[in-house]
């Protein structure tokens, strides 16, 4: 992949895609293609076929997906599995038909079983049942991994799958129903601070920028307070000093790993520039794969891969470090300066108790993270408030 290569980033406006787009630009890649969902419906096969026929991209980064937190995953199960499967099927298949040189498929570490050993190694995939709340999304992402592997083995394509851990960063989703835990906590605690400081202008500004359930900054004050209370941002019951509380689902004991989105983008570009599918298959099968790739037959070569199974070729992308939800919430509280209470609602689900990636494969390939969670929280909160902070980012961009 060179600086003039024609690169299509599917999902270039989201958290993942926008980070990849920005990082590609910073590294001197100029010939980038991006289409919004209004301009290109990736669920529609005919539209995707027409796009590939017209644009003829050389490289594809598949970051488009329907995503969300525990509530959204559980409430919109059919949409999560259908839309993600259709997006993947269309983009991967037409990338093959139109001779894309390389495709990078982005999944999620929710592909691993609920009770998988920690840290999660790539070979733990499909070894036991998934977490129920996000099972449809996870199954779709597993299908994407298998589709890439299968096309590589049968058609000789160069499609690589990566599984990033929980991401956070610029252009994150702060919708209180559909967002992931870290951006949701930042917004809820920020609004809690605004309430305790009686900073009504800041609350109105926040809701005008990101309305909640149709309620914006121009809505009636009572209506605003009601919708905030619905999402657990409300006066502390029985408080004599006007304190406010922020509700957090679960016990706070589960731990999660978090990676700054622009570092994830850096890892993805590193893989696009340096790592091919043949680099993540067993050494003893590389020659067989190369021969089969040269033939580009629609059936496996006579020697094939029957004696040794090729699976789990995906690459985990993460930090290899985790933090409890309780610790995370308190770090965010300290960063924002909220003086109220954090209320952990134990009647709500925790989800998987621990999700920590084993990143030894990624490290062996030559990439490691640099931004730690404390810096990342500050960076994201400053971004959320409209502030810019480049000092921390320069450390890994220059690297």
Where are these regions (language model features)?
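N-terminal Rossmann/SDR dinucleotide-binding element
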Residues: 1-66, 387, 392-399
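C-terminal substrate-binding subdomain of Rossmann-fold SDR/epimerase-dehydratase oxidoreductases
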Residues: 10-15, 19-27, 191-399
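NAD(P)H-binding glycine-rich loop region in Rossmannoid oxidoreductase-like domains
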Residues: 46-85, 97, 114
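Active-site beta-alpha turn of Rossmann-fold NAD(P)-dependent dehydrogenases/reductases
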Residues: 64-65, 104-108, 163-165, 252, ...
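Active-site segment of SDR-like NAD(P)-dependent oxidoreductases
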Residues: 67-68, 109-117, 165-168
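Short-chain dehydrogenase/reductase
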Residues: 81, 85, 133-145, 175-183, ...
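Conserved Rossmann-fold NAD(P)-dependent oxidoreductase catalytic core, especially the SDR/UDP-sugar
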Residues: 89-134, 160, 173
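Active-site Tyr-X1-5-Lys
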Residues: 132-165, 181-197
């Amino acid at each position: 992949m060179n600086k003039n290569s024609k690169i299509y980033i599917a999902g270039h406006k989201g958290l993942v895609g926008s980070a990849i787009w920005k990082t590609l630009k910073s590294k001197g890649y100029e010939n980038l293609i991006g289409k919004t969902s209004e301009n290109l419906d990736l669920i529609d096969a005919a539209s995707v076929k027409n796009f590939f026929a017209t644009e003829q991209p050389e490289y594809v980064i598949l970051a488009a997906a329907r995503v969300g937190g525990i509530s959204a995953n559980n409430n919109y199960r059919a949409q999560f599995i259908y839309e993600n499967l259709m997006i993947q099927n269309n983009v991967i298949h037409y990338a093959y038909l139109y001779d894309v040189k390389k495709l990078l498929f982005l999944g999620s570490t929710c592909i691993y079983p609920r009770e998988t050993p920690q840290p999660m190694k790539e070979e733990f995939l499909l070894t036991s049942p998934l977490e129920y709340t996000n099972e449809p999304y996870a199954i779709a992402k597993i299908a994407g991994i298998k589709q890439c592997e299968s096309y590589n083995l049968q058609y000789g394509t160069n499609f690589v799958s990566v599984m990033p851990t929980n991401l956070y960063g610029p252009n994150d989703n702060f919708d209180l129903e559909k967002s992931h835990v870290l951006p949701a906590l930042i917004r809820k605690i920020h609004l809690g601070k605004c309430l305790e400081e009686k900073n009504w202008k800041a609350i109105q500004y926040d809701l005008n920028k990101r309305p909640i359930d149709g309620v914006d900054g121009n809505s009636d004050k009572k209506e605003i307070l009601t919708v905030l209370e619905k999402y657990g941002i409300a006066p502390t019951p029985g408080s004599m000093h006007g304190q406010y509380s922020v509700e957090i689902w679960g016990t706070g004991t589960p731990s999660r790993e978090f990676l700054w989105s622009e570092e994830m983008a850096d890892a993805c570009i590193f893989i696009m520039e340096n790592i091919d599918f043949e680099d993540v298959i067993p050494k003893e099968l590389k020659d067989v794969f190369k021969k089969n790739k040269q033939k580009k037959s629609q059936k496996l070569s006579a020697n094939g891969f029957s004696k040794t199974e090729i699976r789990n070729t995906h690459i985990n992308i993460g930090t290899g470090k985790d933090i409890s939800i309780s610790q995370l919430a308190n770090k965010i509280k300290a960063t924002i300066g909220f003086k109220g209470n954090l209320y952990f609602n134990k009647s709500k689900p925790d989800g998987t108790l621990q999700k920590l990636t084993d990143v030894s494969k990624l490290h062996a390939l030559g990439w490691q993270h640099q931004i730690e969670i404390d810096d990342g929280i500050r960076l994201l909160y400053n971004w959320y408030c409209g502030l810019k902070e480049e000092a921390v980012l320069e450390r890994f961009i220059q690297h």
